[in-house]
Amino acid sequence: MTSATSNGQEPASGGAPAPAHEPQNDTHVTDNTGEPPLKKAKLDEPFTLNGDKPPRRKGVAPIKAEYLVDINAIPVSAPEENTDDAAEAAHHEEREDDKKKKPKIRGQNTNRTFGRYQDEKGLCPSRVFAPEFSPGECRFGDKCRFEHDLRTYLKEHKREDLTTFGGVCPVWDARGKCYAGWKCRFVGSHMTERDTPDGRKELVLVEDEERKKKSPRLVPYASEEGLANTISVDDRNALSRKKIKTPRADAYSSWLDKTSKQLEKTLHGRRQNDGGVVEFTKEEREEQRANYTEPPFLPSEKRRLYFGPETPTLAPLTTQGNLPFRRLCVELGAQFVYSEMAMSMPLIQGTKSEWALLRSHETELTPPTISPSDKIVQGYDNSKDMKFGAQIAANKPWQALKATEVLSKFTPNLRVIDLNCGCPIDLLFREGAGSALLEHHSKLEKILRGMNAVSEEIPISVKIRLGVRDNAPNAQKLVERLVLGGHESHLLGLGPCGTAAITLHGRSRQQRYTKQADWGYIAETAALIKNLNKRKDELTDTIYEPDERMLPNGGKVYFLGNGDCFSHQDYDDHINNAGVDSVMIGRGALIKPWLFEEIQTGQYLDKSASERLSLVEKFAKYGLDTWGSDEYGVGITRRFLLEWLSFHRRYVPVGLLEYLPPNIQDRPPAWRGRNEMETLLASDHYKDWIKITEMFLGPAHKDFKFEPKHKSNAYETEG
């Protein structure tokens, strides 16, 4: 990457990103033009051609004429369907109710399958890490279905070693130890044959002490593998057998149920004002408060939060927001990240796949980089802050409370626990979760109040949309309730529900991604929240002032905007003109993860094809570090790398554009890159994506399959 701007100026001191490395691979990638990488585009200067430029067409990426391709000269593929909802809740997608309907080659693939990727015959777990002649004892003995002879396994049942990354296991290279043992696809790089006293040759695994010393833990509670927020098998089994008690959630849920019934009885038949609110005199309010039972306990004091202009945030992304991708974004400048959305019931039941979503890398648990200012709330301790938060979904208060309690018990190293009230997927909506809660304000307030009560020191946040239906936004009414507390809460003297931060996605559920996000409405909501934060003391009933522990951040509620951020110009505009505390970025980061770098440096980064390929290489390394370097781990890494490439291929280099800033809603006409690799990275064909993964993960397993999210590309994929 070059460090000059388009007019030859150097970036501000300390702001230039570190140069990317070329792929350390036996596959050499070069720009066929032989030219150095293009310059960065300066913030305020659009690219120009000699002479007059054609006007910018709405909805079409403004690609320079010399890079356009005659579509009549190439085969026409099926039109691309909008797949952006897939990043919301891919593995919670709706299922087709009418099985008799004739399938159409369009829309999203639901219930996708990915084939299988494992050894022809597995190695017995008692042998995986043991020297050849000193295996552990197998409890199944002769009845064991796995291979016990190490040399037979290596020769007949395990695929040949990979030659990518110079033939060296990237996990062993980084940590001095490989956690896949003999099953590693690079095992030749960390094994040797030694002579035994009886004259035999014994195969043994090798560890590198020097490499271990160079890989210290970044946080004290991370595991040897650099992971945190993991739950033990015993604890998961105890959850599945209902042996883990949730006394705080149970007590608070009972109180909520009892109080709700009493309140409903009190309000029934009372006359309402024009706003639909039942009015009480001061004496009546005091009488009602005296009749209600106090909550069983008050919330624990929460860690103070901070969101600011220097803290761009990666949105919770199902499937796409996996650990390797989050790790990549953190490295590129994301200051806060979230887990994929986890469903409350599977968490309560100890489901392995759901708890796996909470695993985080130690780089996600380091403090964010912030600029101290008067906007930081009193009591905020940056050294105790971290980048990683969890997001959950629930349709009933007791589910959300139980899930929150077990999360705070088994994964205490969370920045926040966020409640998803924005997911538009039909399956969740029909169950009353996700965006369905946008129409049940009182219920949502109860859920958040209860979560705040049982979460120990972890703050609670919420992500919402404009509303459920187009032309009927109700987010501002909801926000006022979440900041100040609803009418029922004031009647009981409870005050605000304890939400520390609110994120608003500028679209309705009905709208999905068909139109631009409404940043005008987001700006109005930001102004409303600032006003409510200032007036909170005036609006609070001073006689029944809520306990300070119920008020996160000393009473300040942070507000984040979300939707269509695709450049540092978009980000700055939202901060300065919409008035949000920070911006949450979803699709923009999937298409170009270095968007966080652009925000830090304040300029467009025209990444060359080889620089972009180095990010693909990093994802592959991080995937093997996360899921393992054995056959299964390589297959999982390939699958999620393909998922990311299905979004990343939408990127059109800024050096090819007539106008800046780019618009995330624009779709490009047929175009070619500045070299073959840039063209390959932009391909919309799954076979080209697989070709890219094979540069780092080797040939795909014969049984590997990949079904893209969009059915126009839905072919059986065999590597």
Swiss-Prot record:
Catalytic activities: 5,6-dihydrouridine(47) in tRNA + NAD(+) = uridine(47) in tRNA + NADH + H(+); 5,6-dihydrouridine(47) in tRNA + NADP(+) = uridine(47) in tRNA + NADPH + H(+); a 5,6-dihydrouridine in mRNA + NAD(+) = a uridine in mRNA + NADH + H(+); a 5,6-dihydrouridine in mRNA + NADP(+) = a uridine in mRNA + NADPH + H(+)
Family annotation (Gene3D superfamilies): Aldolase class I, Zinc finger, CCCH-type
UniProt enzyme class: oxidoreductase
UniProt name for this protein: tRNA-dihydrouridine(47) synthase [NAD(P)(+)]
Top-level taxonomic group: Eukaryota
Residues at the active site: 423
Reported function: Catalyzes the synthesis of dihydrouridine, a modified base found in the D-loop of most tRNAs. Specifically modifies U47 in cytoplasmic tRNAs. Catalyzes the synthesis of dihydrouridine in some mRNAs, thereby affecting their translation.
Gene from which this protein is expressed: dus3
A GO BP annotation: mRNA processing
Entry's Gene Ontology molecular function annotations: flavin adenine dinucleotide binding; mRNA dihydrouridine synthase activity; RNA binding; tRNA-dihydrouridine47 synthase activity; zinc ion binding
Similarity remark: Belongs to the Dus family. Dus3 subfamily.
Primary location: cytoplasm
